[in-house]
Amino acid sequence: MILSTTNTIEGATITSYQGVVTAEVVYGTNALRDFFAGIRDMIGGRTASYERIFEKGHQEALRELESNAQKRGADAVIGISMDTGTINVDDKGVLLLITATGTAVKLG
């Protein structure tokens, strides 16, 4: 399966469009990790724990996107776009949201 952020695949012809595919990954935050991340942010350091979560989330979203495209009989997903965000859950914390979208296609 080819995954691409571009709208074409070099050297391949798109023979049919199988529709838009999406994937969402949501992670809950950990209060202790948030506390230490906040301290690190105040002194200007990078928060490796969150970087690892986002990297893992991007990989999981791409795997889910690929799986959804395979269910449609696609050979590739083009025009992939990824986004991240947060969802506030009352006073209980924040959820981290990672989304991926693209167009599933068959190649000739």
Swiss-Prot record:
Alphabetized Pfam families for the sequence: YbjQ_1 (PF01906)
Family: Belongs to the UPF0145 family.
Entry-linked PANTHER family: UPF0145 PROTEIN YBJQ
Protein's name according to its UniProt entry: UPF0145 protein SYNPCC7002_A1337
Lineage: Bacteria, Bacillati, Cyanobacteriota, Cyanophyceae, Oscillatoriophycideae
